[in-house]
C-alpha cells in the first residue's frame, strides 16, 4: 500500500544529486518541453544497463528495494558527495585515448617519411640547369689573321642550352715551320658560362661551321660539318669534338672549295643524309659538284663539271625543294641558275636511272630551261649580290629574296615570277628577316651605307615591299651583322650595331670625321615602340659575327658576338666571345627616344611591357 501511494504522489522534478531522485521542490521552470524529453530519450536509445537515459533508476517493486536504492554505494559517490563515472566510461575513454594516440603516431610517421622522400628527390634527381649567368665574356687570346669569322650555336652537352662553336687562325708564331697555311683551332664554349668544352686542331682556316643531325630520329647525334678555305671538309662529333671523317683532298686535286657544304636528302639509301660541295678550278672558271656520303665522307660517284658564264660574286650553292618535292641546286656567278639534283646524280653515277625521290619535276621551273635543252635553268640574271631562302606564308615552300646592286627583289618560289621589287643602292649586308607588321609575313631589316660614317636602317614590308620604318645613325664598322629574335606573340625584335645616337642628329647632314669612334652600341628595335631604341650593350672592338639562340626552358634569348680588338703593327688583334641574355638586358637597357610620340611613352610603361616578353624558336628557316 505504501508503495502504491509513493508512486501516486511522485511528481516530475529535477534529480537530486544525493538520492538520485527527482525533487519537486527544487524543480525550476524548465525550458525543455515534454517533447524535448521524449526526443532526448529516443536519441539516447532508451534504457540501458538498468538505467534510463535521463539518469532515473528503474522503479522498485517493494519498500525494501526503495530503501536499498536510497543507499548509494561507495563506488558511486566521491569524497565530495557526487557520483563518479561508471567503470565502463573509464574503459571507453582509455580506448578512445589509445586510438587518438595511434592516429597521431601514424600521421606523424607518414609526414616524416614524405619529407624524407622529398629531400631525397631534391638531392638525387638533377634539376634542369638554369642560365644564371646573364652575361659572360671570354678572351681567347690573339688570332693570327684570317678574313672569316665562322660562328655556330648548338647544344653539344645536352643541358638544353645552346653552346658556342667558332674557329680562328692561331698566331703564326705557333705554326709549324714549312707549313704554307697557318693552322686553325676549332673551339666549343659552354653556353652556360663560357668555359671550354673541347677544342680540335684544323689544318687550315675554316670557312663555315654547320651543326645538325644527319640521321632522322630523336636519338640521332649532332654532327658539326666544317668547311675549309682550301680543300678541307670534316665531320666532328659535337659532343666530344672528335673527327668522324675527313674528305680526302685528292678528290679535289683540280680545284678548291668555293663555298660551304650543302646538306642533301639521302641519295645512297644508307639512312644518313648526304652532302654536296662546290669546287672551283685554279685557272678557269669551271665549277665542279662533288656528292659526298654523310656517313663515311667518301664521294658518291665522280665529280660533275659545269661551265658557267657570268661576272660577279659566287652565288650558292643552295638547295631548293619545290612544293611538289622536286630538288634543285641554285648557284651562279653574279646570276642565279638552277640544276636538278637528278641530273647531277645521274652524271655522278654514270647511269640513266635515279632514285624515285629525285625523279620529281617542277613544270614551271622546267619551262625555263635553255632553248638547247641544257641542264641549267635560268632563274635571275641582273647583278646578283646575295641570295636568301624565305619561307612563304601559308605554304610549305620558300620564296627567293635576291639582293642586287640596284634593288631588292622577292621571287615567288612556285613559278619564279617577281612578287615585288624595291629599288635602292648601297645595300651590302644580308637582309635580316623578322615579323614587324601584323600580317604574319616576314619583313626585312636592311642596313644601307649612307655617306661617310653613316648608315641607314630600314624595315621593308615583306608583303608589299614598302618601307615601314627607317632611321639614320652614325656607324664606322663595315658590314656590321644584324639579327632578330621571335617573341611568343609572333613579333620580332631586331638587333643592330651603331655608334652613340647622340653623336649626330638623326636627320642632320653633318659629316662626321673619318676617325672612327671607339665605342659601338647594340640597339634593339621592337615593333610595338617604333619611336624608341633600347641601348643594350657597348663594345670598343669590331663585331665580326653574331648569333641569337633561344633558351626554351626559361623562354629567354641570348645574343652571342664575336669581337676583335684593335690591332697594331706586330701585335695581332685579340679575340673575344661574349654572351648577353636579352631578357636581362631589356630590364637594364637605356631608352633612346628617336622622336616624340603621342601619347608619350613612360619608362615605367615600357619596362612593364618588356618584362612580359618571352622568346621562342623562329618558325622560319633561312
Curated annotation (Swiss-Prot):
Membrane topology (UniProt): Single-pass membrane protein
Short name of one Pfam family: Beta-prop_FAM234A_B
Statement: the UniProt record of this protein carries the keyword Transcription regulation: no
Location of Phosphothreonine modifications: 26
Keywords from the named record: Cytoplasm, Cytoskeleton, Golgi apparatus, Membrane, Phosphoprotein, Transmembrane, Transmembrane helix
Keyword hit for Transport: no
Subcellular location: Membrane; Golgi outpost; Cytoplasm, Cytoskeleton, Microtubule organizing center
Ranges where the record places region Disordered: 1-68
Entries under InterPro entries matching the protein: FAM234 (IPR045232), FAM234A_B_beta-prop (IPR055409), Quinoprotein_ADH-like_sf (IPR011047)
Top-rank lineage group of the source organism: Eukaryota
Residues found modified as Phosphoserine: 16, 30, 33, 62
Stretches that traverse the bilayer: 104-124
GO CC field: Golgi apparatus; membrane; microtubule organizing center
SUPFAM superfamilies in UniProt: Quinoprotein alcohol dehydrogenase-like
Similarity remark: Belongs to the FAM234 family.
PANTHER family registered for this protein in UniProt: PROTEIN FAM234B (PTHR21419:SF25), PTHR21419
Identification of the protein by name: Protein FAM234B
Gene name of the encoded protein: FAM234B
Amino acid at each position: 500500500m505504501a508503495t502504491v501511494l509513493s508512486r501516486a504522489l511522485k511528481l516530475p522534478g529535477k534529480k537530486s544529486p544525493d538520492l538520485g531522485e527527482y525533487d519537486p521542490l527544487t524543480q525550476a521552470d524548465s525550458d525543455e518541453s515534454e517533447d524535448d524529453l521524449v526526443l532526448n530519450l529516443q536519441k539516447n536509445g532508451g534504457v540501458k544497463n538498468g538505467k534510463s537515459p535521463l539518469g532515473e533508476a528503474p522503479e522498485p517493486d517493494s519498500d525494501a528495494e526503495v530503501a536499498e536504492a536510497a543507499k548509494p554505494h561507495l563506488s558511486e559517490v566521491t569524497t565530495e558527495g557526487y557520483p563518479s563515472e561508471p567503470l565502463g566510461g573509464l574503459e571507453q575513454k582509455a580506448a578512445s585515448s589509445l586510438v587518438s594516440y595511434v592516429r597521431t603516431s601514424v600521421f606523424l610517421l607518414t609526414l616524416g617519411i614524405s619529407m624524407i622522400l622529398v629531400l631525397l628527390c631534391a638531392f638525387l634527381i638533377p634539376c634542369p640547369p638554369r642560365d644564371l649567368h646573364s652575361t659572360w665574356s671570354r678572351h681567347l687570346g690573339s688570332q693570327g689573321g684570317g678574313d672569316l669569322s665562322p660562328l655556330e650555336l648548338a647544344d653539344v652537352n645536352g643541358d638544353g642550352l645552346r653552346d658556342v662553336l667558332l674557329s680562328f687562325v692561331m698566331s703564326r708564331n705557333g705554326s709549324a715551320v714549312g707549313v704554307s697555311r697557318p693552322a686553325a683551332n676549332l673551339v666549343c664554349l659552354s653556353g652556360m658560362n663560357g668555359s671550354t668544352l673541347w677544342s680540335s686542331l684544323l689544318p687550315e682556316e675554316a670557312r663555315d661551321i654547320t651543326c645538325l643531325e644527319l640521321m632522322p630520329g630523336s636519338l640521332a647525334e649532332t654532327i658539326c660539318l666544317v668547311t675549309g678555305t682550301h680543300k678541307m671538309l670534316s665531320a666532328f662529333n659535337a659532343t666530344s669534338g672528335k673527327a668522324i671523317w675527313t674528305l680526302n683532298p685528292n678528290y679535289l686535286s683540280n680545284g678548291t672549295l668555293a663555298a660551304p657544304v650543302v646538306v642533301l636528302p639521302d641519295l645512297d639509301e644508307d639512312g644518313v643524309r648526304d652532302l654536296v660541295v662546290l669546287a672551283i678550278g685554279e685557272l678557269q672558271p669551271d665549277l665542279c659538284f662533288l656528292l659526298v656520303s654523310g656517313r663515311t665522307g667518301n664521294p658518291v660517284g665522280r665529280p660533275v663539271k659545269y661551265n658557267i658564264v657570268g661576272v660577279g660574286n659566287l652565288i650558292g650553292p643552295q638547295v631548293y625543294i619545290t612544293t611538289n618535292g622536286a630538288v634543285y641546286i641554285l648557284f651562279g656567278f653574279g646570276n642565279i641558275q638552277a640544276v636538278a639534283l637528278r641530273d647531277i646524280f645521274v652524271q655522278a653515277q654514270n647511269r640513266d636511272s635515279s632514285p624515285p625521290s629525285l625523279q620529281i619535276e617542277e613544270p614551271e621551273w622546267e619551262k625555263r630551261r635553255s632553248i638547247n635543252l641544257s641542264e641549267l635553268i635560268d632563274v635571275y640574271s641582273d647583278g646578283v649580290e646575295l641570295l636568301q631562302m624565305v619561307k612563304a606564308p601559308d605554304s610549305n615552300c620558300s620564296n627567293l629574296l635576291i639582293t642586287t646592286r640596284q634593288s631588292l627583289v622577292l621571287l615567288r618560289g612556285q613559278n619564279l615570277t617577281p612578287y615585288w621589287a624595291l629599288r635602292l643602292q648601297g645595300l651590302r649586308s644580308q637582309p635580316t628577316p623578322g615579323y614587324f607588321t601584323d600580317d604574319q609575313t616576314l619583313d626585312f631589316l636592311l642596313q644601307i651605307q649612307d655617306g661617310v660614317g653613316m648608315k641607314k636602317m630600314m624595315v621593308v614590308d615583306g608583303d608589299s615591299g614598302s618601307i615601314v620604318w627607317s632611321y639614320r645613325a652614325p656607324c664606322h664598322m663595315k658590314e656590321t651583322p644584324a639579327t632578330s629574335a621571335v617573341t611568343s606573340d609572333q613579333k620580332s625584335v631586331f638587333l643592330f650595331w651603331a655608334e652613340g645616337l647622340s653623336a649626330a642628329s638623326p636627320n642632320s647632314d653633318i659629316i662626321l670625321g673619318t676617325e672612327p669612334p671607339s665605342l659601338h652600341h647594340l640597339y634593339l628595335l621592337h615593333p610595338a615602340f617604333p619611336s624608341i631604341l633600347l641601348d643594350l650593350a657597348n663594345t670598343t672592338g669590331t663585331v665580326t659575327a653574331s648569333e641569337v639562340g633561344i633558351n626554351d626552358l626559361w623562354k629567354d634569348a641570348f645574343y652571342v658576338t664575336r669581337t676583335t680588338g684593335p690591332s697594331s703593327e706586330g701585335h695581332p688583334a685579340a679575340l673575344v666571345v661574349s654572351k648577353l641574355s636579352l631578357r636581362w638586358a631589356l630590364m637594364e637597357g637605356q631608352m633612346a627616344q628617336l622622336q616624340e610620340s603621342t601619347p608619350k611613352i613612360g619608362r615605367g610603361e615600357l619596362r612593364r611591357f618588356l618584362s612580359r616578353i618571352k622568346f621562342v624558336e623562329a618558325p622560319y628557316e633561312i
